[in-house]
UniProtKB/Swiss-Prot annotation:
GO terms for cellular component: cytoplasm. GTP hydrolase that promotes the GTP-dependent binding of aminoacyl-tRNA to the A-site of ribosomes during protein biosynthesis. Residues 136-139 are annotated as: G4. Residues 174-176 are annotated as: G5. This is Elongation factor Tu. The gene is tuf. It comes from Helicobacter pylori (strain ATCC 700392 / 26695) (Campylobacter pylori). Belongs to the TRAFAC class translation factor GTPase superfamily. Classic translation factor GTPase family. EF-Tu/EF-1A subfamily. Monomer. Residues 19-26 are annotated as: G1.
Length: 399
């Protein structure tokens, strides 16, 4: 059989495996790469290679993550797998590996377990938009009714966290059996189940919108006044596109202002437009230098609003990661570093939570002293005197 050509023109999607410890996330990751390698769509990665995940630092937090890549007939995937539960929590909260969708691995022999629930909840909180389920270890379950029962439990659990449980694709199989078959050089009955899973992922997880197609947003890093030309605001465009003549809003810290872009520059050259990822200077009509400061954002009018009060899901750095050595309580007042600036805020812990220890993850309510442009999924760091003590993501906006 002729191998298909590996091409880079397919749409790109980021996914990852989530689920309870020992339910087979890493084995499934290895099985997917092994089965697809037989079709010339991936390089085979063995279990140990994925399991010995290198440690990476993301905003000072140590996270062990394995990245593998593979293709299906329709897409190119970047796939992340984490060895430990704590690594998943950190990964999802910091957005170190942004996921467009996830494969939830549940052992058919055990059914949903505490971390199954926690990963679904985290997916909801941090905005992983779509989940496909793989019921693993099917070879260990003789009773078809038991399999159906586990499937029902998983659907109920997904629905409880506002995922469409009834419509979620669920594929049963055995990652280990598929991996063994693939290592022997063939796609057998178990390998077919892995291919079926990937066909569901292809069909169910939509291709994400490209950053350039989203609404324009640029965090303000610096502001200059250029004689005879006006005020230039510099920063890296987070998403969208900005062109000369566009109306933009300046949001955060002070009342929102509207203005018009009269120039876009990169490396002192005039551009027709700046797009996501570009470091640019944007010239603003009639805006005074003192009206704009670091920590504000330039955006498409009406696309993002300033807020002071929100709920967030946070991970608190352990002492070993350079975090606090002691717990904190309600009314703790650190700085919240959002995009390009620190804003002081006070924390309220959930009812029944007395204190938060270094190394914990928890949901908090925050009230900032000045409003910042926020939306669901905005990432922030929690700092004390310039040192990072936590990381979080906005899960709900209150006011």
């Amino acid at each position: 059989m002729a191998k298909e050509k590996f091409n880079r023109t397919k749409p790109h999607v980021n996914i990852g495996t989530i689920g309870h410890v020992d339910h087979g996330k890493t084995t499934l990751s290895a099985a997917i790469s092994a089965v697809l390698s037989l079709k010339g769509l991936a390089e085979m990665k063995d279990y140990d290679n994925i399991d010995n995940a290198p440690e990476e630092k993301e905003r000072g937090i140590t996270i062990a993550t394995s990245h593998i890549e593979y293709e299906t007939e329709n897409r190119h995937y970047a796939h992340v797998d984490c060895p430990g539960h704590a690594d998943y929590v950190k990964n999802m909260i910091t957005g170190a590996a942004q996921m467009d969708g996830a494969i939830l691995v549940v052992s058919a022999a055990d059914g949903p377990m505490p971390q199954t629930r926690e990963h679904i909840l985290l997916s909801r909180q941090v905005g992983v938009p779509h989940i496909v389920v793989f019921l693993n270890k099917q070879d260990m379950v003789d009773d078809q009714e038991l399999l159906e029962l586990v499937e029902m439990e998983v659907r109920e659990l997904l629905s409880a966290y506002e995922f469409p449980g009834d419509d979620t694709p669920i594929v049963a199989g055995s990652a280990l059996r598929a991996l063994e078959e693939a290592k022997a050089g063939n796609v057998g009955e178990w390998g077919e189940k892995v291919l079926k899973l990937m066909a569901e992922v292809d069909a169910y997880i939509p291709t994400p919108e490209r950053d350039t197609e989203k609404t324009f947003l640029m965090p303000v890093e610096d502001v200059f006044s250029i004689a005879g030309r006006g005020t230039v605001v510099t920063g890296r465009i987070e998403r969208g596109v900005v062109k000369v003549g566009d109306e933009v809003e300046i949001v955060g810290i002070r009342p929102t202002q509207k203005t018009t872009v009269t120039g876009v520059e990169m490396f002192r050259k005039e551009l027709e437009k700046g797009e996501a990822g570009d470091n640019v200077g944007v010239l603003l009509r009639g805006t005074k230098k003192e009206e704009v400061e670091r920590g504000m954002v330039l955006c498409k009018p009406g696309s993002i609003t300033p807020h002071k009060k929100f709920e967030g899901e946070i991970y608190v750095l352990s002492k070993e990661e350079g975090g606090r050595h002691t717990p904190f309580f309600t009314n703790y007042r650190p700085q919240f570093y959002v995009r390009t600036t620190d804003v002081t805020g006070s924390i309220t812990l959930p009812e029944g939570v007395e204190m938060v220890m270094p190394g914990d993850n928890v949901k908090i309510t925050v009230e900032l002293i000045s409003p910042v442009a926020l939306e669901l999924g905005t990432k922030f760091a929690i700092r004390e005197g310039g040192r990072t003590v936590g990381a979080g993501v906005v899960s709900n906006i209150i006011e």
